[in-house]
């Protein structure tokens, strides 16, 4: 580009010089023609010519060099006048051409100089940057760069309505399970995969486990500060802390021990382990153990057995894994979504998307064991509760409108979440009525989830 510019400037200068020379020569010729006053027709041996000279007598101008000879195409006076006009026109045109070339060259030079000034500034700035890079960096002056935008948002950054249109109305979108929000943008999955299930269980077993045993006998006392889920497996009687003994010999007694009314109200929520360790602990001892939801429905006489409950001193931190069995379907949908991307050739996929698909596959493989474990627990619970269904149909159903918020499940089908809400009106009712209107289990929801 610079070579073309230099060539244009050079040609412009040449044109200016040539036009200037033509202008000078044209002016000199016009001046010479104007200096000749008259032209006479002279007969020479070769023919007649118009001889123009400064002298009035043509015989005196034959030997002079400043004489003008013209061929008589027209009368001599007309030829002389026409020549003078042509020379003046040529002089004017040369002057105009010289002016145009000079202006064009000047504008081009100005444009070149204006474009070279930023280059000079950039060269000076680059030299200063080199000098700064040569210095020793100060940690206090370091400013961290702005992190790039997440590529997960471009992979799955549509609204929930659009998600349903893309995947289907009966599919749970993936961000509802492995979703996160970074600066108000819903991304595809968390940056780090969830921790392994075995590592979390081993850590919680060392820090947050505490067990207690219930002695055999007609009466059992429990701590008034915590709700205790009691159980009778084959035969025996069990009472609550109020001191009232059960006189029924054919019906079991499964109650939630309530604290004295003078004490403070119970905590609103008691959370057990998400994987229901009571069931796994009982499978090793070959002793059938029911969860709190199933124990409230049992109408058979069972023997008293030792039940180990694991409770945490503080609530567990939320982990990025599903909390209920109904989320297992979304895992299948996620596998289908990953399979769609894997159908494409690796050449068409960018490295970022390929790495994202591999991370999702690793997360799904790490959580398959956890979901199978939850399904096994639900199946075991269904087998235990199957014989007691005829007797449970005779129990009085609790109205959810009259006593809202008695049982809360964090998600539909959660096996290990039980909450007790303090109800002032229920405390003022007689205890017999409370026992008659005890809550029923959500085993139907669990069965539906398993199916």
Swiss-Prot record:
Residues 107-451 are annotated as: Mediates interaction with EPN1. It comes from Mus musculus (Mouse). Functions as an activator of the E3 ubiquitin protein ligase ITCH in the ubiquitination of the CXCL12-activated CXCR4 receptor. Thereby, triggers CXCR4 endocytosis and desensitization, negatively regulating the CXCL12/CXCR4 signaling pathway. A motif (PPxY) lies at residues 148-151, 194-197. GO terms for molecular function: ubiquitin ligase activator activity. GO terms for cellular component: early endosome membrane; late endosome membrane; plasma membrane; recycling endosome membrane. The lineage of its organism: Eukaryota, Metazoa, Chordata, Craniata, Vertebrata. GO terms for biological process: CXCL12-activated CXCR4 signaling pathway; negative adaptation of signaling pathway; receptor internalization. Interacts with ITCH; enhances the ubiquitination of CXCR4 by ITCH and the subsequent endocytosis and desensitization of the receptor. Interacts with EPN1. This is Endosomal transmembrane epsin interactor 1. Residues 204-224 are annotated as: Disordered. Residues 107-451 are cytoplasmic. Residues 204-213 have a biased composition (Polar residues).
């Amino acid at each position: 580009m610079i070579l073309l510019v230099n060539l244009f400037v050079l040609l412009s200068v040449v044109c200016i010089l040539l036009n200037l020379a033509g202008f000078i020569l044209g002016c000199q010729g016009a001046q010479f023609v104007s200096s000749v006053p008259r032209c006479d027709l002279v007969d020479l041996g070769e023919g007649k010519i118009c001889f123009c000279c400064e002298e009035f007598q043509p015989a005196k101008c034959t030997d002079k060099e400043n004489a003008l000879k013209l061929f008589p195409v027209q009368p001599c006076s007309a030829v002389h006048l026409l020549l003078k006009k042509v020379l003046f026109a040529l002089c004017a045109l040369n002057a105009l051409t010289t002016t145009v070339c000079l202006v064009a060259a000047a504008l081009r030079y100005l444009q070149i100089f204006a474009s070279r000034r930023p280059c000079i500034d950039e060269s000076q700035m680059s030299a200063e940057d080199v000098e700064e890079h040569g210095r020793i960096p100060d940690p206090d002056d370091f400013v961290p760069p702005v992190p790039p935008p997440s590529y997960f948002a471009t992979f799955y950054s549509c609204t929930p309505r659009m998600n349903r249109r893309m995947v289907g109305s009966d599919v749970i979108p993936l961000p509802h399970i492995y979703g996160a929000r970074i600066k108000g943008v819903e991304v595809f999955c968390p940056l780090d995969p969830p921790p392994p299930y075995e590592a979390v269980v081993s850590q919680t077993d060392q820090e947050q486990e505490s067990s207690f045993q219930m002695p055999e006998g007609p009466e059992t006392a429990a701590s008034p500060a915590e709700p205790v889920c009691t159980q009778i497996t084959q035969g025996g009687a069990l009472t609550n802390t109020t001191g009232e003994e059960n006189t029924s010999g054919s019906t079991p007694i499964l109650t939630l021990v309530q604290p004295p009314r003078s004490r403070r109200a119970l905590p609103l929520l008691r959370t057990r382990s998400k994987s229901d360790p009571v069931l796994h602990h009982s499978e090793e001892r070959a002793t059938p153990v029911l969860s709190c939801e199933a124990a409230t429905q049992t109408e058979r006489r069972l023997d008293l057995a030792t039940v180990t409950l694991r409770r945490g001193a503080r609530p567990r931190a939320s982990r990025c894994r599903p909390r209920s069995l109904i989320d297992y379907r979304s895992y299948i949908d996620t596998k289908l979504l990953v399979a769609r991307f894997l159908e494409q050739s690796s050449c068409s996929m960018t490295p970022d998307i390929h790495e994202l698909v591999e991370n999702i596959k690793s997360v799904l493989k790490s959580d398959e064991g956890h979901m199978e474990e939850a399904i096994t627990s639900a199946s075991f619970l269904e087998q235990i509760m199957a014989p007691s269904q005829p007797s449970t149909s005779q129990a009085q159903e609790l109205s959810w409108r009259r006593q809202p918020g008695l049982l809360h499940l964090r998600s539909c089908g959660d096996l290990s979440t039980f909450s007790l809400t303090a109800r002032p009106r229920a405390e003022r009712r007689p205890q017999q009525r409370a026992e008659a209107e005890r809550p029923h289990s959500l085993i139907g929801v669990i069965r539906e989830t398993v199916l």
